């Protein structure tokens, strides 16, 4: 399933929310790629914009093009390696907000369904108990609306399209999701209503715990609260004692 048209937002060109000599974090708008695509016309991306601003910037993780919110980059290869290792060992913690289709009855719960690529329908992913990788998402209802529900999503694993497929599996696809939602849910909003609001990680130089937060445009009531859901150590733990993702 190829991208038919790519017209990313240009204002603001870059929205840096935190920067020091080792890392840089930005608020990526919906509709902008995290990294360049293969066609030259898909070069414009969060990384490409930042590399003009900071030539040493390195990719640490990605957000789907349609997802907005907090994305973290490293400055230099050493910082890149240190941060990527935290994602690999599940030392980072994230909170997303989403508006989903339908009114959810259950206040909270979790989805534990293995995911893999749906190869004939790429880039779609699918639930697959034979070949899928373990995938776990926790969810909490924060606001019920007439036709939709705003939920807080806490991914424990970080699979491609995990939140989108897991919410679809509950019968509540994310509003504006042109891959997994029915037409009426897609047309209900002008963008995918999924936002990466909060990230908790260990600063790669100091090794002290750090949290960053980006307000959610479609749910401005969102507040920082990641440490209410996790109890990480204040200092970076020993990798040798941890299992990999």
Swiss-Prot record:
GO terms for molecular function: 23S rRNA pseudouridine(746) synthase activity; pseudouridine synthase activity; RNA binding; tRNA pseudouridine(32) synthase activity. Keywords: Isomerase, rRNA processing, tRNA processing. The active site is at 64. It is an enzyme of class 5 (isomerase). It holds the Pfam family PseudoU_synth_2. Its EC number is 5.4.99.28, 5.4.99.29. The keyword Nuclease does not apply. It catalyses: uridine(32) in tRNA = pseudouridine(32) in tRNA; uridine(746) in 23S rRNA = pseudouridine(746) in 23S rRNA. One of its GO terms (biological process) is tRNA processing. Belongs to the pseudouridine synthase RluA family. Dual specificity enzyme that catalyzes the synthesis of pseudouridine from uracil-746 in 23S ribosomal RNA and from uracil-32 in the anticodon stem and loop of transfer RNAs. PANTHER family: DUAL-SPECIFICITY RNA PSEUDOURIDINE SYNTHASE RLUA, MITOCHONDRIAL RNA PSEUDOURIDINE SYNTHASE. This is Dual-specificity RNA pseudouridine synthase RluA. It comes from Vibrio cholerae serotype O1 (strain ATCC 39315 / El Tor Inaba N16961).
